[in-house]
Amino acid sequence: MKNPDVIVVGGGPAGAACAWFLAGQGARVSVLDRARFPRDKPCSEYLSPEASRILSVMSALAPIEEAGAAHLSGMRIRSPNGTTFQGDFVAAHGWRGYSDRGVAIRRTILDACLLDRARAAGASVEEGVRVTDVIRDSRGRVRGVCTLGEDGSNRERTAPLVVAADGLRSVISRRLCLARRARFPRRLALVTHYEGIEDVSGYGEMHVEKDGYAGIAPVGNGAVNVAVVIPARGAAALAGDRAGFLGRWIAARPHLAPRFRNARRITPVHATGPFASHAHRAWAPGVALVGDAADFFDPFTGEGIYAALRGAELLAPALLQSLSASSVVRADAALWEYDESRNKEFRGKWRVERLIGAAVSVPLLMNTAAGSLSRRKEMADLLVGVAGDFVPPREVLNVSFVTRLVVDALLGMAPLERHRSVTAANAGRVPASPAI
């Protein structure tokens, strides 16, 4: 496309959705991606109940359903000591999402479908094009990108606005020094697909261990997404053998290994990470960040695809406003407002994610929290509803919820302490002689 209004770098959910929203309003949009679709992507491949609303708006929900997407009714979480709790999306708390179930679908299907919707709206999509740098004018304003084609050709492409939807290791974010790597938690993930895993149900599963965690979820057509997330310091243990490491990790878990005895891995093992990246702001003059390029903390809550879609929905109106602005100052103000609205939208969820990330990193804390949530189903439902993006984070980020969690944890520990006291007392007694 010649003279686009917006260049979108990245054709994943964030980029495709942004292109769809923009093109539908008459903007000239060029989407660039270094991959050729369909392509696989290491991801939990889970879309929360609220993500279905945006898919429906894009007329993408029906094609995804027809492609065989799996449906999830909630989440089951197992702590390191074996305590398990379950949260359901449909629950007594009364909050309801756009859908009563989450959706799980292979990225090979999802991304191709969303890109097709962007094309149908009028966006130009170029595959096999890698963005290598940004173009800036004399004042430092972004005016386009430099690209490298599969044939080795270099090209400069210009546009009034650029969208960085190029993921966790965003080239644009790095070039503009917008990204910050957090020190905690530093994790990486190994992701693959199996068929034939036993006892797979209509729930997503998270199995937390002392040295990482595993996620298991059906993604339709008999395939099951399996992700093992480990501390980044354990990367050396992979030793170039991702599949072997993942197999050994699962085999070492007595509660998981039997379920895989007749399973067959059907896709290569992909690696991604380290995670915990956050842009100190999601815009700069002439450019805006969306999706993982703007923020990605940890995959445990599986919010990445919803955040990408919702972020694109927030960004598109700001880009249109920026394009029609009467001055550079007003154009930048529109991007600043996007950043503010994004922070307002996701701030509560970010706090919940970080609290969960802390619990996952400390086995004692995770065991204690799991014990409370296993006894308080209504609290587990609320927490899973927040993760499902339809229960407001304030429902768990309040004194009442935290107090109930702590009190229940203390009450749950009390019988154990009494048992220990009795055991210790009995250990010091001399058994009475039997009566004759």
Identify the residue ranges that each predicted region occupies.
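Glycine-rich FAD pyrophosphate-binding loop
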Residues: 23-43
